[in-house]
């Protein structure tokens, strides 16, 4: 009596009871169902649901499997419960379905807590027979797990469609502002999920816009039911030859696979006997021979463990009863007291026929769809086709301009950006910000040696295009409005005027270098070089170095030079006059220069109307051209050393007694102002200082004269140009 009281009321027994309570509390999941009632002995079962959540249930110690199953179905509010079951693993790692007629403790040996998993036990041969939306949702979750684990093999196209249905059911309609292709990588649909598949899933998802979650899940099931291994319960066995085979339990019968090849199908009506003994499973099938007589064929399969053999037999009995019978087999009332042969297991649930005929869908059901597990997002390497920008190739100009470069005896150190097209081309443009220090720095660093007018289909080429490093992805500066008709008419008149000046071509060689700058005002035509209206400077040091180069004597002086210091030019024009005797001599020199340049350009440079960008232009007769040229040249030569300031180093003075002006042109450089038929090639020594760059100079409009400044008033657009540096000559 004292020992009994000591065991019951002692401190040791009380501590053991408290430890059990703490252990039970720790084993409980977030969702707990207390179903033990007033039972003193309680067991805790933890069930993992298809959506990934866990539910813990407290039951009496001697509770059977059906009680736990009913608690789970009640918690889920699931009516079509006959398609599902609770599965557990034994000590031999063999999966078993919980038998509702037996005690939980006798079946599940590993506990407490006793861990079980809710799974689909019988896959409906026709998903449209599933009446409840919740049932279809759970079927979709089960099929997702089967495909992801590799149990259910799925082709690429089918896997893409099924995954797209999953996204539509979980995320809804595709939204361009919210969803990106990388979003698909956060989900897992197949064991080997590639980037190509994710992009295909993303595109397929867009096609399913407008489907509700219920519709997407129904379409998912209707697509998945056509998979070859849909609803097949596979079990690995060995035959008498020692090779491994697989038996697949289906609604229609038993499939036999050798590896992945299906070699036989035993229909349920043809199977007359199915039993097991230890680890051997015997299958007797009746087939008709050639003469129409029935013959029995016996197949014996071996399994690794007797429990696995019994599990396969029980699954075959349940599949046969669920899909083939109208109702479950009634158990016999009498039992043999001493002798019992075979197993007493019989399927006790409803059949598919009973489930589809008796169950009726409820008017309204509500349940919560839980989101899928997310993973880290992948950075996609392929994002579809990348359309190239509308830019010219930087590798074509070198090959196209080889002839002109060989004629002038120079090479182009940088690639040239050009276009080759048979007609007008639309180019996306980008206006660069004014006074860009970085752009000016890049222009000053790169040598300027480009001959772009050799291409007949050349578009407008700006100084920014010439000096900027070759980059096919960068947009071109914005071209001005093109008036091709006006410029073509002006060019024809210029060529006609220059025909009268061909006799004086040899007189230009007699001009020597002058000390100061000889500006050239161009009142008729003004070509906007770029959006900043900036002109690259040409330093006097570079000019002085160039004049000492022996290769300079062979260079012709073209007329398309332009000085951007218009203010100094206007002051030089109105400041002084010159004697008439000097005008005649200079006029002949000017005519010689214009004729020589025009003839050269007509012979070498093709006309491209699309590349011209005139602002304004005027025409004049040849007589007025010569008269204006002589007057302006006289005024400039008189005020040459008085009004123009030289901000560079003091130039060297030549010892020549005869003062004859000659242009100083940098070597190894080629400048194009964008006018077809007028190209300028500048050649200078490599050691020339190019810190301030070069000045791009355009040809005067009504006349083609060298070193001539018009006395016409400047245009409003020209007055806005900033004074960069003076183009100097050396005496």
From Swiss-Prot:
Stretches the record annotates as Required for interaction with CRB1: 29-119
Domain FERM: residue ranges: 43-327
Alphabetized SMART domains for the sequence: B41, FA, FERM_C
Keyword annotations from UniProtKB, A to Z: Cell junction, Cell membrane, Cytoplasm, Membrane
Tissue note: Expressed in the outer limiting membrane, retinal pigment epithelium, outer nuclear layer and outer plexiform layer of the retina (at protein level).
Taxonomy, superkingdom: Eukaryota
Subcellular location: Cytoplasm; Cell junction, Adherens junction; Cell membrane; Photoreceptor inner segment
UniProt keyword Cell membrane present: yes
Name of this chain's protein: Band 4.1-like protein 5
UniProt organism field: Rattus norvegicus
Gene behind the chain: Epb41l5
